[in-house]
């Protein structure tokens, strides 16, 4: 049977969480212990999760791609079909989007940048930014959204973020994670520029999550990207 909830002798109450709680702030520099755990102690696991998002999106993009060898007519026909589902100049929705999208994006950036100081981080902040992009798309359509965010943009942004994350933590592969300290100092706990590499990793995760969330919505909406 399952162990009783909250019991002091539960198997999970061992030296591992005790190490996180007692030494997490000193070793990671992150006031938010959860962020210190997933982006420092378990950074490789988080890197794998980010790669799963990117690979899943790329796989769907490949499956839904249009073969250019079939001619330009099929591409033009698909683009025409996409425009059928464009919003019909909904004044109310566009007005609301003009008001809400900027603070939504700013709040998402705030959640990412302050993930090591309190609740938040790359996953939640990226989801907020992705929601803002989806709202903008629903209000103004593909024609305006694709001026600054296309499938190619997503691929390069995600590839760059994942490459930066991998390079930032790759030294552990060669050291075996044996108490090697980051070249970036931990700083003063509670300051925005603290916790060493965690702030950079949060930004990388946020970019991947925001792009993946928006791209999946686009693919569900028009059957490709």
Language-model features: where?
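Interfacial/capping segments of alpha-helical transmembrane domains
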Residues: 1-23, 177-180
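Hydrophobic cores of alpha-helical transmembrane segments in multi-pass inner/ER membrane proteins
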Residues: 53-62, 131-137, 201-214
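Individual transmembrane alpha-helix segments
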Residues: 29-61
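Alpha-helical transmembrane segments
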Residues: 138-153
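A structural-propensity feature for long, helix-poor, extended segments
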Residues: 151-183
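Membrane-interface helix caps and helix-loop-helix hairpins in membrane proteins
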Residues: 112-121
């Amino acid at each position: 049977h399952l162990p009783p909830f909250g019991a002091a002798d539960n198997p999970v109450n061992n030296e591992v969480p005790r190490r996180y709680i007692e030494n997490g702030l000193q070793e990671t520099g992150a006031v938010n212990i959860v962020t210190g755990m997933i982006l420092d102690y378990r950074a490789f696991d988080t890197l794998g999760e980010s790669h799963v998002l990117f690979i899943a999106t790329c796989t769907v993009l490949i499956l839904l791609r249009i073969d250019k060898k079939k001619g330009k007519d099929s591409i033009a026909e698909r683009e025409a079909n996409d425009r059928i589902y464009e919003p019909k100049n909904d004044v109310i929705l566009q007005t609301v989007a003009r008001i809400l999208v900027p603070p939504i994006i700013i709040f998402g950036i705030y959640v990412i940048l302050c993930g090591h100081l309190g609740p938040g981080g790359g996953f939640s902040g990226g989801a907020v930014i992705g929601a803002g992009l989806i709202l903008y798309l629903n209000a103004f359509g593909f024609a305006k959204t694709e001026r600054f965010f296309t499938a190619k943009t997503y691929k390069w942004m995600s590839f760059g973020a994942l490459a930066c994350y991998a390079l930032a933590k790759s030294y552990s592969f060669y050291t075996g994670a044996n108490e090697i300290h980051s070249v970036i100092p931990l700083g003063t706990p509670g300051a925005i520029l603290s916790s060493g590499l965690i702030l950079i990793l949060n930004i990388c995760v946020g970019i991947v999550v925001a792009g993946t969330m928006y791209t999946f919505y686009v693919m569900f909406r028009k059957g490709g990207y």
